[in-house]
């Protein structure tokens, strides 16, 4: 299903966190969650079913959350001995997560943490680890704004979130604003580089998560699964650990909130996704990829995924907060960018894509809506739900033929799924709409479309009819405005090429004349 560009579901970031509460914990020294520690291996099992009317208990899976370098943003700081410039990652993280069905059960608010653990429909069960150390009962006071947030993702369970007599009430309400959203495909891509096959039906098969690991930060990584015993988590997160601000955006799976960690005072973006919607849309695999890939990425132009946790209703991703919101919001306000700003933005995104491609990761959904703007016009590539990672020894030009030598019916079915269109219609390359094999060059095509949209204000193949858009893409029917810079046209024409092998490389983009001649005019606080 393709959504029209003027659909009300197109996301727009809104106002930042309410600063009235930002100074509550200024004197707090922070907790171990936000100290620089190596990422610990985690091995957990979960059970998932549709939300029940019970008091939710949250369980967390915490990655390292460093102290921010700048105000109001949770950016990464690590030991200089463990990184090279802004390209670094932890090779020790190896996570194995399992979704399995469970029977309906109930629990009371006064139950012990072990009973709460066993009654949750989405349960973590680490090996050789006491349950009391893994979770904690959520009997703390919770404001109405938190309950209001949870009920927005699942209205049927909203009454279960306000039954406690200990909870405070608040008249504070969050404001929402939406913009027309670009047409996107809704079919979940079935790409995977793991031998474990994800069955869309939770009642018939388990879903195993295996986090990507790497021996070096510069080599292409491969996906692996581990069953070793995990150490004690550094710290568990619950909704009680955060104060909620305004809504930053909303989508089909839930909303994104600006939150403040009470103990440390750090600001984050909390992405909330309804479990029922994830199961109904069969997007478990997409969520798995997003967590696997993004949690291992450490780059100045990529949004950090610090941690994730869940309760009986929702799954929560704790993300780096970008104070200026989406790039699309700024583009819509200014109509288009000049050559200086556009060239700087293309340079930053190219740096992020080079970092991803060196690690065998294809983003596959590059567009202004998935690019965040932080302080000093620093861009952050986000939303890795459509991304995929390929093995080092895999033929990168034949991603969908990972099981080409095996001919079992089940594998043939998986092969067909890998041909599914993913991403945004306006940014799809010809090889994807024609169901051909694709590789890293799909991101290069999308980079050319992004460059055109930043300079012109709209994608080159935009049309009122989906079939017309397909025809324009297949023929590469692109028209340039007369006022467009000649060097910019040259760059776009070398990126938006039908033959993937003839597209300009990312390193050549950095050295293109359009980038070189505008680079001295960029703001001095960016890439000195």
Swiss-Prot record:
CDD domains: STKc_Aurora (cd14007). GO terms for molecular function: ATP binding; protein serine kinase activity; protein serine/threonine kinase activity. Component of the chromosomal passenger complex (CPC), a complex that acts as a key regulator of chromosome segregation and cytokinesis. Has a role in error-correction of aberrent kinetochore-microtubule attachments to ensure that sister kinetochores become bioriented and connect to opposite poles by promoting spindle assembly checkpoint signaling. Its main location: nucleus. Keywords: ATP-binding, Cell cycle, Centromere, Chromosome, Chromosome partition, Cytoplasm, Cytoskeleton, Kinase, Kinetochore, Nucleotide-binding, Nucleus, Serine/threonine-protein kinase, Transferase. GO terms for cellular component: chromosome passenger complex; cytoplasm; kinetochore; nucleus; spindle microtubule; spindle midzone; spindle pole. It comes from the Eukaryota. It comes from Candida albicans (strain SC5314 / ATCC MYA-2876). The gene is IPL1. Residues 1-35, 48-235 are annotated as: Disordered. Residues 95-104, 129-155 have a biased composition (Polar residues). ATP binds at residues 248-256, 271. SMART domains: S_TKc. Residues 18-29, 59-94, 105-120, 185-230 have a biased composition (Low complexity). This is Aurora kinase. GO terms for biological process: attachment of spindle microtubules to kinetochore; mitotic spindle organization; regulation of cytokinesis. Pfam families: Pkinase. Belongs to the protein kinase superfamily. Ser/Thr protein kinase family. Aurora subfamily.
């Amino acid at each position: 299903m393709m959504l029209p560009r003027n659909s009300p579901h197109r996301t727009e970031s809104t106002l930042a966190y309410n600063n009235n509460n930002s100074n509550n914990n200024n004197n707090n020294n922070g907790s171990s969650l936000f100290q620089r520690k190596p990422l610990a291996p985690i091995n957990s099992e979960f059970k998932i079913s549709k939300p029940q009317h019970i008091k939710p208990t949250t369980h967390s899976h915490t990655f390292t959350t460093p102290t921010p370098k700048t105000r109001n943003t949770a950016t990464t700081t690590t030991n200089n001995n463990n990184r090279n410039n802004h390209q670094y990652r932890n090779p020790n993280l190896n996570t194995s997560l399992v979704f399995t069905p469970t029977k309906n059960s109930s629990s009371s608010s006064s139950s012990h943490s072990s009973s709460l653990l066993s009654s949750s429909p989405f349960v973590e069960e680490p090996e050789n680890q006491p349950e009391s150390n893994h979770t904690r009962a959520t009997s703390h006071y919770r404001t109405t704004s938190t309950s209001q947030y949870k009920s927005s993702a699942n209205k049927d369970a909203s009454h279960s979130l306000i039954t406690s007599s200990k909870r405070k009430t608040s008249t504070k309400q969050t404001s929402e604003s939406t913009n027309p959203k670009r047409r996107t495909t809704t079919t979940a891509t079935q790409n995977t580089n793991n031998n474990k096959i994800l069955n869309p039906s939770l009642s018939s098969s388990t879903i195993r998560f295996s986090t990507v690991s790497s021996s070096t930060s510069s080599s292409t990584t491969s996906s692996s699964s581990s069953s070793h015993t995990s150490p004690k988590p550094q710290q568990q997160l619950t909704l009680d650990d955060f104060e909620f601000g305004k809504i930053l955006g909303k989508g089909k799976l839930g909303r994104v909130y600006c939150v403040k960690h009470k103990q440390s005072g750090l600001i984050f973006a909390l992405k909330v996704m309804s479990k029922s919607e994830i199961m109904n849309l069969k997007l478990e695999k997409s969520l798995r990829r997003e967590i696997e890939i993004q949690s291992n990425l450490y780059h100045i132009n990529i949004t950090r995924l610090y941690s994730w946790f869940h309760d009986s209703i929702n799954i929560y991703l704790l993300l780096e907060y970008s104070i200026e919101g989406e790039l699309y919001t700024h583009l819509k306000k200014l109509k288009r960018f000049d050559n200086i700003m556009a060239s700087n933005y293309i340079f930053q995104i190219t740096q992020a894509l080079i970092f991803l491609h060196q690690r065998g990761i294809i983003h596959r959904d590059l567009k202004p809506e998935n690019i965040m703007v932080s302080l000093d016009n620093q861009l952050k590539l986000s939303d890795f739900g459509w991304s995929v990672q390929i093995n080092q020894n895999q033929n990168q030009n034949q991603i969908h033929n990972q099981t080409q030598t095996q001919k079992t019916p089940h594998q043939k079915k998986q092969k067909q799924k890998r041909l599914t269109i993913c991403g945004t219609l306006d940014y799809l390359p010809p090889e994807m709409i024609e169901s051909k094999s694709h590789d890293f060059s799909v991101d290069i095509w999308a980079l050319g479309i992004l460059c055109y949209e930043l300079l012109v204000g709209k994608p080159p193949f935009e049309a009122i009819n989906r079939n017309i858009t397909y025809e324009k893409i297949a023929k590469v029917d692109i028209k340039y405005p007369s006022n467009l810079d000649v060097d910019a046209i040259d760059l776009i024409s070398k990126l938006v090429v039908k033959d993937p092998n003839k597209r300009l490389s990312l390193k050549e983009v950095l050295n293109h004349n359009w980038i070189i001649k505008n680079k001295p005019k960029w703001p001095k606080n960016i890439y000195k």
